[in-house]
Amino acid sequence: MSRSSRVLGFGHHAPSRKVENPEIENRLGLEPGWIERRTGIRSRFWATDQDTLSGLATQAGDMALANAGIDRSDIGLLLLATSTPDHLLPPSAPLVAHKLGLGRAGAVDLTGACAGFIYALMFADGFTRLHGKASLVIAANILSRRINPAERASSVLFADAAGALVIGACEDPDLGILGASVDSDGSRYGLIQIPAGGSSIPFHDDLDLGQTRMTMTDGREVFAKAVEMMTDCSTSALAVAGVRPQDIDRFVPHQANARIFDAVGRNLGIADEAIVKTIAEYGNSSAATIPLSLSLAHRAAPFRPGEKVLLAAAGAGLSGGAIVVGI
């Protein structure tokens, strides 16, 4: 029988500082309720001075490993999806693996922005199927340190959090990734970006610090393209899996904006009550939102054997994807 994979454990972590909308609305001169009406966000968590990206990731990974109940020596690979590593060099994943005591695991960062967890989960699934070894997939971001406080678009949306899944080998073809679809559109490369800090605009003495902060040039186009990409990828992934939208037990979308994932749900014909929504309390932590939402959903109502779950994301790059998972 050919080898498959399955989800063994869930984990998540958010910093201790909770930031309510009035704090941001007052700073930006926005009327009360403006943020929630346009995004669905009521609060978000931001890192304290003591928090690090590797620290948040380690907390989520530790929870997922405990939830999975497996020996840490059984983990063969750690993938860390992040846009805000501790340093530009070296990657943060080896440090996280060290903190978690994963003495026999490879570890590497993936920079896929909001879709990073989708790609990381696909790669981990392939590794586990090939080698029969468990994988730990973590997505984590500290976006509050990249927010431009003068730019409304980024100030109201972004948050800090981490989420994690443990993936293990199995021989049940109805478990693990049943179908997947990915996409990109580099013609919209500049819609969401941090302009400086890479090799195109390197750090220098006269650098405007504003160029090291997040910027969104056209929110309406981001909205339209995200809805389109998430809908198209989800439709393709469902077709590959041979699963109808109405047979999806839970739809766990990237929590970019409530209006985005509500539109995707309507496009797909997925009932609103099947959509997992965490954006109201946790905001948009980019790649971390999907594993965070999975872990929170599992804590509130544990996944039942046989559930089929749809994951979908789109974001900077533009890059996106969708996965159908059998739990």
From Swiss-Prot:
One biological process term from GO is:
fatty acid biosynthetic process
**Residues at the active site:** 114, 254, 284
Enumerate the Pfam families for this protein.
ACP_syn_III, ACP_syn_III_C
Q: What is this protein's name?
A: 3-oxopimeloyl-[acyl-carrier-protein] synthase
Q: State its role.
A: Involved in the formation of the biotin precursor pimeloyl-ACP. Catalyzes the condensation of glutaryl-CoA, an intermediate in lysine degradation, with malonyl-ACP to produce 3-oxopimeloyl-ACP.
Keyword set includes Signal: no
Class in the EC hierarchy, top level: transferase
Q: Which keywords belong to this entry? A: Acyltransferase, Biotin biosynthesis, Transferase
- The disulfides recorded in the entry are none
Q: Which family does it belong to?
A: Belongs to the thiolase-like superfamily. BioZ family.
Q: Which SUPFAM superfamilies match?
A: Thiolase-like
Q: What happens when the gene is disrupted?
A: Inactivation of the gene leads to biotin auxotrophy.
Listed pathway(s): Cofactor biosynthesis; biotin biosynthesis
EC number of this enzyme: 2.3.1.-
